Amino acid sequence: MPQLDKFTYFSQFFWLCLFFFTFYIFICNDGDGVLGISRILKLRNQLLSHRGKTIRSKDPNSLEDLLRKGFSTGVSYMYASLFEVSQWCKAVDLLGKRRKITLISCFGEISGSRGMERNILYNISKSSPSNTGRWITCRNCRNDIMLIHVVHGQGSIK
């Protein structure tokens, strides 16, 4: 497209406006066009907002069950990953003993994983909502649940 100058400016502007408004009217007047989609989205959002008020339950037991399931799933994933790391550490340590080299003496071991699991489950049950309606807050979770790395040579977690 050539640069706009005094002679071609008007014709380029005219054709640009003609094509733009033609396509704009064609798209917007179509029932499935842009305006049709926006109408559908507005209606969908209204229906979801009305339905969302009836779906959300204010039953404290259901919320407590959801929190318990979430925490237990997290603990099971953590325990599974710690178990895999522990198995890997044992395999590498056996290879090191066969070669008379300790490859992971400074790497650490995950022998306290069962103690961690007991501690986390105890803290979850301790900070779960009581009959007074107190819910688990981020402050309680931060103070009660901690990830602990057991360095090689330390005892069990107490």
UniProtKB/Swiss-Prot annotation:
Reactions that this protein is recorded to catalyse: ATP + H2O + 4 H(+)(in) = ADP + phosphate + 5 H(+)(out)
Gene Ontology BP terms: ATP biosynthetic process; proton transmembrane transport
E.C. no: 7.1.2.2
InterPro entries recorded: YMF19, YMF19-like, YMF19-like_N
GO molecular function terms attached to this record: ATP binding; cobalt ion binding
Subcellular location: Mitochondrion membrane
Keyword DNA damage: no
Membrane topology of the entry: Single-pass membrane protein
Entry keywords, A to Z: ATP synthesis, ATP-binding, CF(0), Hydrogen ion transport, Ion transport, Membrane, Mitochondrion, Nucleotide-binding, Translocase, Transmembrane, Transmembrane helix, Transport
Catalytic class of the enzyme: translocase
GO-annotated cellular components: mitochondrial membrane; mitochondrion; plant-type vacuole; proton-transporting ATP synthase complex
Membrane-crossing segments per the record: 7-27
Misc remark: A stretch of 270 kb of the mitochondrial genome is duplicated within the centromere of chromosome 2 resulting in the duplication of the gene. The expression of this duplicated gene (At2g07707) is demonstrated.
Assembly and binders: F-type ATPases have 2 components, CF(1) - the catalytic core - and CF(0) - the membrane proton channel. CF(1) has five subunits: alpha(3), beta(3), gamma(1), delta(1), epsilon(1). CF(0) has three main subunits: a, b and c.
Functional summary from the UniProt entry: This is one of the chains of the nonenzymatic component (CF(0) subunit) of the mitochondrial ATPase complex.
UniProt family annotation: Belongs to the ATPase protein YMF19 family.
Protein name (Swiss-Prot/TrEMBL): ATP synthase protein YMF19
Phylogenetic placement of the source organism: Eukaryota, Viridiplantae, Streptophyta, Embryophyta, Tracheophyta
Primary gene name: YMF19
